Amino acid sequence: MSSSDGKLRYDGRVAVVTGAGAGLGREYALLFAERGAKVVVNDLGGTHSGDGASQRAADIVVDEIRKAGGEAVADYNSVIDGAKVIETAIKAFGRVDILVNNAGILRDRSLVKTSEQDWNLVNDVHLKGSFKCTQAAFPYMKKQNYGRIIMTSSNSGIYGNFGQVNYTAAKMGLIGLANTVAIEGARNNVLCNVIVPTAASRMTEGILPDILFNELKPKLIAPVVAYLCHESCEDNGSYIESAAGWATKLHMVRGKGAVLRPSLDDPVTIEYVKDVWSNVTDMSKAKHLGAIAEASGTLLEVLEKLKEGGGDAIEDAFEFNSKELITYALGIGASVKNAKDMRFLYENDADFAAIPTFFVLPGLLLQMSTDKLLSKALPNSQVDFSNILHGEQYLEIVDDLPTSGTLLTNGKVFDVMDKGSGAVVVTNSESFDESGRLLVRNQSTTFIVGAGKFGGKKDPIAGVVPLQPAPNRQPDATVQYTTSEDQAALYRLSGDKNPLHIDPQMALLAGFKTPILHGLCTLGFSVRAVLAQFADNNPALFKAVKVRFSGPVIPGQTLRVDLWKQGTRINFRTVVVETGKEVISGAYVDLKSSQAKL
């Protein structure tokens, strides 16, 4: 209710405040009474360590309230006898509407020095006392279909504090208690919230620095607690931190997590946990869960994916900005000599954008950085840079592409084939922006030399994106590019640091006389040709590309890209001019629309 002057009132309400003889509790009691509530001032009157008892502290506050024209009674019971505390309210005023569990003591000791008594006394007052008072008040509140309950936690409980094992355990326990009370009371308009105050009091005197102690006035927190207890406040299960005239809401969050096995039939190993630990502890995609059902629902989703034999078994974060986009564009031959390439090379260009094939990198780097997508597919085979060849690549752009940000990429093994001389592993990945929007899909086909003859199937399953042979006619257009002798050295700066492309010894081990150009670099050149010829260099028109890497390119060789237009599908092949050999075959780009230059 509110008065004519707009002030929130508590007329007709009965408020029980424990530990109200001083500090925060006193301020709560005075403010409730000032605004019309009838107040039970509970205080045992002991020291801050819980020793002794006295009626004086509660009596002084009751006198203050009465002298100001308010109504109040004192209660001297220990909060452990919560039923007696609430009985005082019922006998004096016939109801209880508000309960502020504020009473507390300190018995600070280090972990090793904390005695059984130190532990029990602190937990009895803070946690058990709050439970007993709440348990006694709850039936009255449910019957009258109204109640407001406050639990008092602490930053020490949330973050920990040296020498307070008993106190911090109790204060964190109060958050759990409040969560359940909030759930049980909701249907009867009995709401429960947590206050996390930092204020000067008998308990903190001598602990906090003087300058901080003097500014942490309990009076500045009282209005926050009072509002949480007003009938107009509908918060339930909230944790509110307040100090020095400031307040904020706290809540717990949970990261996206990581799946620790490929399927329900696979074990969880210590080594696998170690390998994905950075994903387990990654909080970049953390979110708040409002109920235990949400947490259980997420686990059910994970189990369903495991039941299907997959899921987001591997995850990786991919960060990029204009620098990475420009480095990539230079790596696939974009040049300032071509005015239309400036949109890919200058971050202040009005049309600055990413070349779409840049977004093969999140899936590729996920595969390279973890090495688990391939090795778990062939657990009995050696998989390393010396025996893997990139066979095919599919890239699909699902939504508008940003020019900077962080992408979370989920990858899994999709198919494994036995080709005799080696194995073919198909991996799928999806990349999401920070809001959870799906931007990119990648499908990569890798040939592992010498890993075949394991008795597997030879043909792909449905869902492996097929190639499409070029039409049997003359190309509609041809574009030619000359690569630099440093092309591979430049392209590898975008993240594909397979030594095969720069180290002569590694190239020899893989069966090449000299380091070869990355297949994905050749792909980038080829897609640039498609965009230039059929999309007016507009990357927004690009939808998807599929290619097979059918031969090596030596840096410095010339690439000829032959193009066939069939509606919005552009078939192409890429040939090394010096040798006449195809290096990309069965390839096509799908455009959203075409702006042909034939």
Swiss-Prot record:
Superkingdom field: Eukaryota
Catalytic site positions: Y167 (proton acceptor)
SUPFAM superfamilies membership: NAD(P)-binding Rossmann-fold domains, Thioesterase/thiol ester dehydrase-isomerase
InterPro entries for this protein: HotDog_dom_sf, MaoC-like_dom, MFE-2_N, NAD(P)-bd_dom_sf, Peroxisomal_Beta-Oxidation, Sc_DH/Rdtase_CS, SDR_fam
Signal peptide: none
GO cellular component, as recorded: peroxisome
Subcellular location: Peroxisome
GO-annotated molecular function: (3R)-hydroxyacyl-CoA dehydrogenase (NAD+) activity; 17-beta-hydroxysteroid dehydrogenase (NAD+) activity; 3-hydroxyacyl-CoA dehydratase activity; 3-hydroxyacyl-CoA dehydrogenase activity; enoyl-CoA hydratase activity; estradiol 17-beta-dehydrogenase [NAD(P)+] activity; protein homodimerization activity
Transmembrane segments: none
Alphabetical keyword list: Fatty acid metabolism, Lipid metabolism, Lyase, Multifunctional enzyme, NAD, Oxidoreductase, Peroxisome
Positions occupied by motif Microbody targeting signal: 596-598
GO annotation terms (biological process): fatty acid beta-oxidation; fatty acid beta-oxidation using acyl-CoA oxidase
Pathway: Lipid metabolism; fatty acid beta-oxidation
Location of the region described as (3R)-hydroxyacyl-CoA dehydrogenase in the Swiss-Prot/TrEMBL record: 1-309
SMART domains in alphabetical order: PKS_KR (SM00822)
Quaternary data: Homodimer.
Further facts: Complements functionally the S.cerevisiae peroxisomal MFE-2 in vivo.
Role of this protein: Bifunctional enzyme acting on the peroxisomal beta-oxidation pathway for fatty acids.
Protein name in UniProt: Peroxisomal multifunctional enzyme type 2
Organism this protein belongs to: Drosophila melanogaster
Gene it is expressed from: Mfe2
